[in-house]
């Protein structure tokens, strides 16, 4: 009997070990932080347990009244969730999980899914710390995913929770960041090298792409770039949309000075292999500890093209700029050389989005079966560690999917809540393995309800792009792999007379009556047409191939967590959550197991002997 009880206790311990993550307590340090308001009176700290799917927030506000924190969307505060708390004058605390019935009215949720960890007040500020599951079973709670989260913070001067525009703030944040740079290696011999445009006068135009060619650091032996960050001139930040650094082939003949990147002189558009990138809303980016961008060998670039996209919508005159990119490099070599692969839809007008579209999906295909031929050497598996997603103002979501032998394997990276004003490189939870012959598909979702004109692919902010940059290792000689649809097929499917000249077909499409039916017909034709895939090497060699857009199987949401603590498999097919299909369903035969706690190991030794005894005696 004692053995039976011991064995049952062991099973309970094992189940507990695998079902519980590391809970953060009232005073545990939290890795991430942001100010949520311009005056820096609202400060958020947070951390999460990815395996247990629990996130912990700590909101500190300069008020002695109520405070609130939640998640909203890009269109309206209505339906936003908001956890509200404060300290009464008598020292008692109040705390509840609520939601917004309208932009002014709060209502308490029927299910209280936020757990209070700490709520304090001093003469200046109120601090509220609480935790909640990534996904609750309460329809009034927004899911916490790897998408861009629009974090809502609100407060008041007293203890009567009431929304006011003056004290309400929304900030787009990647809550589920995978790496914290303070935990990463910062070599003692770090050297800094700045790549800056030289005293450039920003033109009085809505959009300018300025390019200049600059040398990389001159080193006598191999070094690794392990981090980059933007250099932004104070007061010019609102004009700089993105900064890109392209590696040049060492045989390239490069121009001098500063020129329009995509203007009349094609020399200023030379070099197309991105090695570092920043866009509006982003911060610095540091590679994982075992990878870096190689410089200093005969195979490495010696020069780069610095591209800065300016948006001077107010047409301000005489603004001088010296923005650019700061590189951090070291002689302490990492295990792998990092590469950057650009995927998506080729950036020219064959990519189009009709006006007045509630939703329009565009696709860019990449086929890797020619990589080895273009690389000039055998290509082994490559590992994707991070990605940077990029569209312009009409973009609403993006995702990159991986296929092998015609079967969808996984979503490599995605953002179903994309924000043009927050474009940061984001680390993946685990490296994604790409094998030779795999196909990669980029899907972009656009909305053009505010436009009465066609939107074409192009460099201007009012044009569109559909791009995802993969940071991967080990580096190969491929710089980009982009697709575009057969515009002749699309024109015919819309009932128009097609021309062999692609630009004439675009003029025809520009005159189509874009009813909802024609918008859907165009989207369907673009997806069903044969894709031309352009593969480019670092040395600007280009190879074409063709392919077809595969079907996309939506990833089901994972189970929700009830306020009682139990997980529930929802009976829905909403393609929302950050979680992939469970390993048992994905065809994988491997899984990473977490180590058992020591107490379970000790019980295991006794339980196995008891189990053997029970089997022998028939108990």
Swiss-Prot record:
Glycans are attached at residues 250, 405, 477. Expressed at low levels in thymus and testis. Cu cation B binds at residues 390, 392, 465. Coiled coil: none annotated. Disulfide bonds join 211-261, 248-271, 366-481, 444-466. One of its GO terms (molecular function) is dopamine beta-monooxygenase activity. Binds 2 copper ions per subunit. It is an enzyme of class 1 (oxidoreductase). The lineage of its organism: Eukaryota, Metazoa, Chordata, Craniata, Vertebrata. It comes from Mus musculus. This is DBH-like monooxygenase protein 2. GO terms for cellular component: membrane. Belongs to the copper type II ascorbate-dependent monooxygenase family.
């Amino acid at each position: 009997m004692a053995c039976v009880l011991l064995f049952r206790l062991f099973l309970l311990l094992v189940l507990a070990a695998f079902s519980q993550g590391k809970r953060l307590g009232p005073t545990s340090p939290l890795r991430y932080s942001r100010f949520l308001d311009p005056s820096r009176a609202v400060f958020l700290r947070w951390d999460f347990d990815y395996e247990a799917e629990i996130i912990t927030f700590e909101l500190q506000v300069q008020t002695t009244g109520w405070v609130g924190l939640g998640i909203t969307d890009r269109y309206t505060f209505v339906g936003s969730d908001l956890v509200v708390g404060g300290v009464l004058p008598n020292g008692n605390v109040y705390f509840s999980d609520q939601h917004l019935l309208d932009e002014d009215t709060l209502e308490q949720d029927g299910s209280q899914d936020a757990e209070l960890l700490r709520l304090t007040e001093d003469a200046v500020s109120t601090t509220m710390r609480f935790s909640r599951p990534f996904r609750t079973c309460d329809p009034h709670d927004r899911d916490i995913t790897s998408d861009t989260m629009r974090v809502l913070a609100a407060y008041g001067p007293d203890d009567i929770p009431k929304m006011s525009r003056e004290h309400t703030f929304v900030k787009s944040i990647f809550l589920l960041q995978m790496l914290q740079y303070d935990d990463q290696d910062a070599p003692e011999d770090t050297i800094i090298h700045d790549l800056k445009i030289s005293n450039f006068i920003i033109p009085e135009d809505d959009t300018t792409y300025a390019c200049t060619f600059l040398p990389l650091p001159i080193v006598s032996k191999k070094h690794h770039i392990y981090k980059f960050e933007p250099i932004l001139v104070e007061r010019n930040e609102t004009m700089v949309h993105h900064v890109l650094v392209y590696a040049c082939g060492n045989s390239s003949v490069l121009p001098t000075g500063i020129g329009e990147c995509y203007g009349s002189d094609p020399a200023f558009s030379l070099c197309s292999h991105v090695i570092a990138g920043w866009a509006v809303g982003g911060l610095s980016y540091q590679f994982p500890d075992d990878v870096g961008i190689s410089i200093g060998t005969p195979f490495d670039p010696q020069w780069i093209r610095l591209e800065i996209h300016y948006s001077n919508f107010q047409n301000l005159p005489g603004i001088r700029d010296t923005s650019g990119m700061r590189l951090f490099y070291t002689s302490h070599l990492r295990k792998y050389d990092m590469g950057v692969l650009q995927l998506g839809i080729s950036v020219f007008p064959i990519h189009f989005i009709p006006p007045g579209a509630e939703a329009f999906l565009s696709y860019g295909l990449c086929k890797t079966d020619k990589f080895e031929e273009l690389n000039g050497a055998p290509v082994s598996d490559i590992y994707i560690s991070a990605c940077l997603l990029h569209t312009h103002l009409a973009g609403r979501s993006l995702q990159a999917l991986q296929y092998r032998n015609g079967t969808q394997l996984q979503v490599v990276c995605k953002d179903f809540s994309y924000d043009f004003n927050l474009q940061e490189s984001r680390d993946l939870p685990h490296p994604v393995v790409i094998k030779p012959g795999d196909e990669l598909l980029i899907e972009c979702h656009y909305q053009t309800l505010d436009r009465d004109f066609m939107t074409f692919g192009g460099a201007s902010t009012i044009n569109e792009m559909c791009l995802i940059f993969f940071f991967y290792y080990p580096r190969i000689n491929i710089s980009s792999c982009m697709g575009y649809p057969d515009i002749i097929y699309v024109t015919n499917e819309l009932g128009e007379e097609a021309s062999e000249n692609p630009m004439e077909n675009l003029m025809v499409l520009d005159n189509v009556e874009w009813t909802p039916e024609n918008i859907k017909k165009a989207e369907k034709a673009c997806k069903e047409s044969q894709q031309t895939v352009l593969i480019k090497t670092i040395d600007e060699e280009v190879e074409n191939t063709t392919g077809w857009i595969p079907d996309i199987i939506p990833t089901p949401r994972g189970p929700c967590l009830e306020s009682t603590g139990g997980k529930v498999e929802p009976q829905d097919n909403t393609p929302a959550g950050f979680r992939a299909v469970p390993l048992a369903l994905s065809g994988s035969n491997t899984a990473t197991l977490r180590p058992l706690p020591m107490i379970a190991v000790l019980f295991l030794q006794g339980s196995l002997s008891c189990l053997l005894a029970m089997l022998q005696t028939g108990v």
